[in-house]
Amino acid sequence: MDGRVGLRASRRAAPTPRVAVRSSPRHRARVREQEPVVSAMSGSGLGKENKAGSSTPLRHRPNAFSELDNATPRVMLRKIIQNQPQVSPLALQTVQLEETEDARPEPPSQRTSSTVELQLPDLVPEDASVTTFRMTRKRKKLSISEFERAADKRLPQNQAHSTLDSTLVRSLRMSVGSVMAPDTVEKRGLLRRPQNHKAIDIAAFEGGVEQNMLQIKAQDYLVDLQTSSMTGTTTIRTDAEVVLNNTELFVEPQLGEQNLLAVEPQLSDSKTSAQRSNTSYPAHEKARLEGLVSRVSTDERRTLRFSEKDLITDHEHVDGITQKTPAKQGEEEQDHSQQNDPMEQFSESEEMAGTTEHHADAEYSEHSEKKLSRKAVSQLTAAQDAGVEMEMTPSEGGVAEGTEHQDSPKAELQMAGSPGGHSPASYSLEKPGAKPLKEAVEQTGEIERGTITGVLDAAEEEATDDESDKEDHESEEISMKTPMFVHAAAYRPQPVLSPPHPVKSASPELPPQPVRAKPVPKSSGAAQRKTREPEIASSLIKQIFSHYVKTPVTRDAYKIVEKCSERYFKQISSDLEAYSQHAGRKTVEMADVELLMRRQGLVTDKMPLHVLVERHLPLEYRKLLIPIAVSGNKVIPCK
């Protein structure tokens, strides 16, 4: 009972929403209006009402309370929801708007004139309820070309072209609802930078092309100079190479008077190129060779001053020589050169120098240089053959001696390449009275072409004899027999590749001294001892151990202590090495030792390393390990 009373009291104290609605004056008015209806329905049983008056209103109260329940906010909200039409969120329904006024079709002329208010005909206005569900969908993009096509279809064919042509500019500006604005307006940071195309200037382009051509020409000129200098330094080492370089594939036609005048500028160019190639020689050699060149030029002038009668006799002598066989010509030339013809040797050296000059200037004019060199050589040889019949003057003998005793092969090349060696002959041939001399020169050139092979064969045999014989007098005879142009080919300057063959000295070679045996070093006894591992001195271990024991110790005990200390220090060294390697160092530092002693338990926060050293080690070791203050305001060890 007490529980029920308490429950009722709690209900009264905190009324529910239903009780609050019932207690409202509006609810009471509704109950009063419904009481007559209830009494009419229960008019038949009045007697029963008296008997159980308290029960009848209780029977009809549920109907009244059911009506009252319908008035709650929940029921009212439910009824509102039930009265509303059912709309599914998935299946969208388009709302059809009733058109109050029928849209009258406008003529196309009026519709095209109002381009600002023109809208798309196919688009249907959407309801707000529908657009809420279409927020995530993208609008359909419509291009202007499609819009124009649709407009053309709806317009009559007669007015389509005229109206669209007149309103083409305005149609591009009209506002179409479905056309999206370009993204470039909103996101200007994403715009691509316009490419700046530089305008090409024709004058600048042509100037650049000309500069490139000039650079290419300059590079080609430098390459030509380098190749010409390299060809000038190449050497002909063997006699076979000399023969190959002097051979010809065909007999060239003889030069006439007209060709001489046409070839003169080429000769001057070849002379200048030869002068350029000769500038690389040292200055002191040039000074020594200039005297020889002047002597040779004076002798050539003397030989060219002979009369025409002498030249005719020489010409007859040359005709007699041509009837001989090549073998006899080779033998006669060998005998003639051995006896008294050093000038012919000089002419042959001149011929060889002309061929070398041709190799040096091959990059500039190959074919013209061959003709010029052969012409100059034939001129000199003709003049010298004419002078062979005459008696040799002292000056000619001096020239022969100069040509025989030249120390360096550079002198012969300098004489061949200098303008003084060929200028008198070339100038004297241009005179009107020198026609017989020209004919003699041409014939002597043909003779030398046929006889040079025999001379070279003899030179090869003599070269082999020179290699086999080592005595000095035999080498001198062989050098006299061999022609000068073979020596010039063998002793050409070799500044880069290989040095020239040295001339043998007249002094006899000394026998080699016997090599003395080196004294064997005496082996010391300390070196024969086996190397031992580093270890602590036994005296130090005894001293430290006796310091702490302070009692007499036997020898066996010291041995055991030494073994223990050795093992202990080996283990310490391995641990310290591991610590240093782990730290990335190759040296053991104080921090590694302190870390090891801390792990062993010797060093702690209460017992630092310095205190431990001061307690257990004597003064001499303390001075080495930790700083100690001494008299005189000094600290040991000094840091």
UniProtKB/Swiss-Prot annotation:
Bias (Polar residues) ranges? 267-281
Biological process (GO) annotations? cell division; chromosome segregation; kinetochore assembly; mitotic cell cycle
Keyword flag rRNA processing: no
GO cellular component term of the entry, any: kinetochore
- Taking the record's annotation, the residue ranges forming a coiled coil are none
Q: Which Pfam families match?
A: CENP-T_C, CENP-T_N
Biased-composition ranges for Basic and acidic residues? 307-319, 329-338, 356-371, 432-449
Region Disordered, residue ranges: 1-64, 266-294, 307-451, 458-477, 494-534
Localization, per the record, is: Nucleus; Chromosome, Centromere; Chromosome, Centromere, Kinetochore
Residue ranges for the region (Flexible stalk domain) are: 80-500
> Keywords of this protein's UniProt record, alphabetized?
Cell cycle, Cell division, Centromere, Chromosome, DNA-binding, Kinetochore, Mitosis, Nucleus
Give the Low complexity compositional bias ranges: 12-23
Please quote what the entry notes about the protein's domains. The largest part of the sequence forms an elongated and flexible stalk structure that is connected to a C-terminal globular domain with a histone-type fold.
Q: Which family does it belong to?
A: Belongs to the CENP-T/CNN1 family.
Its job:
Component of the CENPA-NAC (nucleosome-associated) complex, a complex that plays a central role in assembly of kinetochore proteins, mitotic progression and chromosome segregation. The CENPA-NAC complex recruits the CENPA-CAD (nucleosome distal) complex and may be involved in incorporation of newly synthesized CENPA into centromeres. Part of a nucleosome-associated complex that binds specifically to histone H3-containing nucleosomes at the centromere, as opposed to nucleosomes containing CENPA.
Q: What else is known?
A: Association with CENPA-containing complexes may be indirect and due to the proximity of centromeric nucleosomes containing histone H3 with those containing CENPA.
- Report quaternary structure and partners: Component of the CENPA-CAD complex, composed of CENPI, CENPK, CENPL, CENPO, CENPP, CENPQ, CENPR and CENPS. The CENPA-CAD complex is probably recruited on centromeres by the CENPA-NAC complex, at least composed of CENPA, CENPC, CENPH, CENPM, CENPN, CENPT and CENPU. Identified in a centromeric complex containing histones H2A, H2B, H3 and H4, and at least CENPA, CENPB, CENPC, CENPT, CENPN, HJURP, SUPT16H, SSRP1 and RSF1. Interacts (via N-terminus) with the NDC80 complex.
Which protein are we looking at? Centromere protein T
Specify the species. Gallus gallus
